Amino acid sequence: MKRVLTALAATLPFAANAADAISGAVERQPTNWQAIIMFLIFVVFTLGITYWASKRVRSRSDYYTAGGNITGFQNGLAIAGDYMSAASFLGISALVFTSGYDGLIYSLGFLVGWPIILFLIAERLRNLGRYTFADVASYRLKQGPIRILSACGSLVVVALYLIAQMVGAGKLIELLFGLNYHIAVVLVGVLMMMYVLFGGMLATTWVQIIKAVLLLFGASFMAFMVMKHVGFSFNNLFSEAMAVHPKGVDIMKPGGLVKDPISALSLGLGLMFGTAGLPHILMRFFTVSDAREARKSVFYATGFMGYFYILTFIIGFGAIMLVGANPEYKDAAGHLIGGNNMAAVHLANAVGGNLFLGFISAVAFATILAVVAGLTLAGASAVSHDLYANVFKKGATEREELRVSKITVLILGVIAIILGVLFENQNIAFMVGLAFAIAASCNFPIILLSMYWSKLTTRGAMMGGWLGLITAVVLMILGPTIWVQILGHEKAIFPYEYPALFSITVAFLGIWFFSATDNSAEGARERELFRAQFIRSQTGFGVEQGRAH
């Protein structure tokens, strides 16, 4: 019987070489009632939270940033919930299951961006901005052009990420719950719209917090049971895994995932700087009251995520022992049922039985809902706040801006559902990779240099930002993933899978060159305004504080 060829590697950033890409058909599995019941409990509970949140959303600040009343600890959990996708859980544990130590190296790529956010971005971002990162980028530059560029960068990242999440959700739910793919995509889209439409950032935050707690609990239990099996000895864990894995001792060696040093460097830079340019992550720093709480947010988030990625390493090696060596989880051809991405799900069954399998399946679904809700709110705020209220209709009232935001949520939700259905059998692995590359090549350079480089001008930011965005897209199209695997050409024009090294370089050089050669009076004025911006970014004087409801 033909099983799943893929589950969720496509939602893993730069997952072209991760376990499997999403492509081809998935055969529906028998209906998993335990998983469905647990998921329904989660949905009912979170819809209750959305109703509670809707009664407290009275203003633009409430809708975009939960009134700035989220604590650093709560925001840290929510950031972790926003960032730890189902692909992190299933994809990285699958990488460890197939490649061993390389999976740990890959997971570190998700973490290395957070020290940059902590030391370079979080505090100044909170002190300078209100609702979106474009508030920061345009603080002393021309509002119109910079907000259009920032909004375009945000919307492209959100759209690519959203499509990948929707397709991944449909495939995953079809596999785990036995539901029809189209029903699954519509269900995710409708729930996503309800959370954001009625509850805004407050509901989205609590959905992300609940999801993070459930995911951390589930992963902790699995890791505990694996370590209990080996007498809480890492030496026994690795020895037993090496004894049963087809690659033997080679699973403890690095270097099998990335072909050459250029690809490795480009992948690392994309993951590192892409994280610091994701609009739905940056938006979370405006939900706390001040810069101190923003720093706390990153501290807690990094701790939760670091702990989680250590757990995925243990889970991956546990799957090698308890799943890979067990014929119950193999099909007639000797392959893992459902593909390698199902390693963690099968391990849940192995250590906790059917009930825990249902719990982990429901958590995987909840994980996708939390991520798409954050993405949708980031996309809606880019349209309503950056474009509508600050470019096309300056001076718009809060009521008008919120109305546009909610209309955008509906449009984004409908588009996400339609594209999720259209891309059902397409290889969309490149989409999240491209999203990270664009975030690293367009959003990150502008955010960083607008806060730290006194000589930045609007001309430099515009030219460098657009060059970075276009370079990332063009190189991705000309690279092996799209040019060869999707378009069917014999040889790629651009030889590397990951464009970030080149597109980031183009962006920074473009910003530097066009700013340095800008001798206009407007450019001189923008340079003079840096001192006032610097004082605000350091002291927070004049920043909008959180307030009680």
From Swiss-Prot:
The UniProt record lists the keyword Membrane: yes
A Pfam family hit: SSF
Transmembrane segments: 33-55, 76-98, 103-125, 146-168, 183-205, 212-234, 261-283, 303-325, 359-381, 402-424, 428-450, 462-484, 494-516
Location of the protein in the cell: Cell inner membrane
Molecular function in Gene Ontology: acetate transmembrane transporter activity; glycolate transmembrane transporter activity; symporter activity; tellurite transmembrane transporter activity
Cysteines engaged in disulfide bonds, as pairs: none
Membrane association type: Multi-pass membrane protein
Principal location class: membrane
Cytoplasmic side, ranges: 56-75, 126-145, 206-211, 284-302, 382-401, 451-461, 517-549
A GO-annotated cellular component: plasma membrane
Any one biological process term the GO annotation gives: plasma membrane acetate transport
The UniProt record lists the keyword Transmembrane: yes
Periplasmic topological segments: 1-32, 99-102, 169-182, 235-260, 326-358, 425-427, 485-493
Keywords, ordered alphabetically: Cell inner membrane, Cell membrane, Ion transport, Membrane, Sodium, Sodium transport, Symport, Transmembrane, Transmembrane helix, Transport
UniProt-listed PANTHER family: CATION_ACETATE SYMPORTER ACTP, SODIUM/PROLINE SYMPORTER-RELATED
Annotated function: Transports acetate. Also able to transport glycolate.
Family statement: Belongs to the sodium:solute symporter (SSF) (TC 2.A.21) family.
Additional record remark: Although ActP belongs to the sodium:solute symporter family, the experiments did not allow to show that acetate transport depends on sodium. The inhibition of acetate transport by the uncoupler CCCP indicates that the driving force used by ActP is a transmembrane electrochemical potential. However, it does not allow to discriminate between hydrogen ion or sodium ion-coupled transporters.
Protein name (record): Cation/acetate symporter ActP
Provenance organism: Escherichia coli (strain K12)
